[in-house]
Amino acid sequence: MSWTQPALLTCLLVLSAITLFDGADSAVSDKRDAVNPQGALRKIFMPEADAASFFKRRSRRAVKTQDEINAEQRQRLAADERRREYHEEQRNKYENYAEEENDEQDERTREKTEQWREFHYDGLDPSYEYNRHTI
């Protein structure tokens, strides 16, 4: 029970301080703020007349202007160029990889052939097996 009295007294002091000072008015929004939005809200929302004419300016079936057609064509061409460059780069990477693999395979084959020749060498040049004279 001893802690309830100081807690109650503290709550009353805080409540009286809030009601006496004008700083509490800033937490409440005024009607004029809603009428005149400022900052980010002004960028998001537009007047009703502009919003109505926004969709009237160009409907879905309206013909595109030449500038719009040219801009879309430039975007398409740029995308095609990026795609072409990407595929060319991938093809070059694969060709380099395949060439290195073939070179390594050729090297392994050459080494194995040399080892086989050294193992089967009989002292004759060319080797006796390949230089037989038929009688």
From Swiss-Prot:
Main location: secreted
4-carboxyglutamate: residues bearing it: E68, E72, E81, E85, E88, E89, E95, E99, E100, E104, E107, E111, E114
Coiled coil ranges: 64-114
The UniProt record lists the keyword Lipid biosynthesis: no
Pro-peptide region(s): 28-61
Biased composition (Basic and acidic residues): 65-96, 107-123
Subcellular location: Secreted, Extracellular space, Extracellular matrix
Keyword Secreted among UniProt keywords: yes
InterPro entries per record: UCMA
GO cellular component, one term: extracellular region
Compositional bias (Acidic residues): 97-106
Gene Ontology biological process terms, A to Z: embryonic skeletal system development; regulation of osteoblast differentiation
UniProt KW keywords: Coiled coil, Extracellular matrix, Gamma-carboxyglutamic acid, Secreted, Signal, Sulfation
Modification after translation: Proteolytically cleaved by a furin-like convertase to generate a persistent C-terminal fragment found in almost the entire cartilage matrix, and affecting osteoblast differentiation. Sulfated on tyrosine residues.
Transmembrane regions listed in the UniProt entry: none
Region described as Disordered: spans on this chain: 65-135
Signal peptide: 1-26
Record family assignment: Belongs to the UCMA family.
Role played: May be involved in the negative control of osteogenic differentiation of osteochondrogenic precursor cells in peripheral zones of fetal cartilage and at the cartilage-bone interface.
Name of the featured protein: Unique cartilage matrix-associated protein
Gene name linked to the record: ucma
